[in-house]
Amino acid sequence: MAAENPSVSGVAGRYATALFELARDQKSVDAVKADLDRFKAMLAESPDLTRLVRSPVFSADAQGKALVAVLAKAGIGGIAANFLQLLNANRRLFAVHDVIRAFGALVAKFKGEATADVTVAEPLNDQNLDALKSALKSVTGKDVTLNVNVDPAIIGGLVVKLGSRMVDSSLRTKLNSIKHAMKEAG
């Protein structure tokens, strides 16, 4: 299955595929996804947790003890907790972000959904997010989950990546196009 979807390749893809197949067999795909999303949010909020996960300086034992405490505090248990502990035992915890992303792609494919990566200069409000989801749904015919990244460097507009397609309507790109046109004309 990992070979069918380019977004789930490599080590992260193999781990995500194994986790997905187990979760599907146990009929707990949604619960595992919710737990992994909670862990991903914790990583985004805590630089210390991110450092613990990514740094090879910590021993597997130290990471394991800290991970058990973090998972217990977050209420993450069952398959997701066992899986995260397996990643730690195999010294692959540094790849957890990519594994979670690949798992999400597998879940979306399983449910007939699409995932779009959207880059914006400023956070979008709920009304704009809903409008973007509706527009993408009308194009794809599928429910669309948005992964929104804020990057002030694009100045304005947005960049949408959906599968192998990308639409770049950022102000930065438009300004670069004008700059190149002026160089060629000048």
UniProtKB/Swiss-Prot annotation:
Cellular component aspect of the GO annotation: plasma membrane; proton-transporting ATP synthase complex
An annotated Gene Ontology molecular function: proton-transporting ATP synthase activity, rotational mechanism
Chief place where the protein resides: membrane
Cysteines paired by S-S bonds: none
Pfam families linked to this entry: OSCP
PROSITE patterns linked: ATPASE_DELTA (PS00389)
Domain of life: Bacteria
Membrane-topology annotation of the record: Peripheral membrane protein
InterPro entries: ATP_synth_OSCP/delta_N_sf, ATPase_OSCP/d_CS, ATPase_OSCP/dsu
Subcellular localization: Cell inner membrane
Keywords annotated in UniProt: ATP synthesis, Cell inner membrane, Cell membrane, CF(1), Hydrogen ion transport, Ion transport, Membrane, Transport
Subunit and interaction comment: F-type ATPases have 2 components, F(1) - the catalytic core - and F(0) - the membrane proton channel. F(1) has five subunits: alpha(3), beta(3), gamma(1), delta(1), epsilon(1). CF(0) has four main subunits: a(1), b(1), b'(1) and c(10-14). The alpha and beta chains form an alternating ring which encloses part of the gamma chain. F(1) is attached to F(0) by a central stalk formed by the gamma and epsilon chains, while a peripheral stalk is formed by the delta, b and b' chains.
Similarity field: Belongs to the ATPase delta chain family.
Function: F(1)F(0) ATP synthase produces ATP from ADP in the presence of a proton or sodium gradient. F-type ATPases consist of two structural domains, F(1) containing the extramembraneous catalytic core and F(0) containing the membrane proton channel, linked together by a central stalk and a peripheral stalk. During catalysis, ATP synthesis in the catalytic domain of F(1) is coupled via a rotary mechanism of the central stalk subunits to proton translocation.
Protein name: ATP synthase subunit delta
Naturally occurring in which organism (per UniProt): Rhodopseudomonas palustris (strain BisA53)
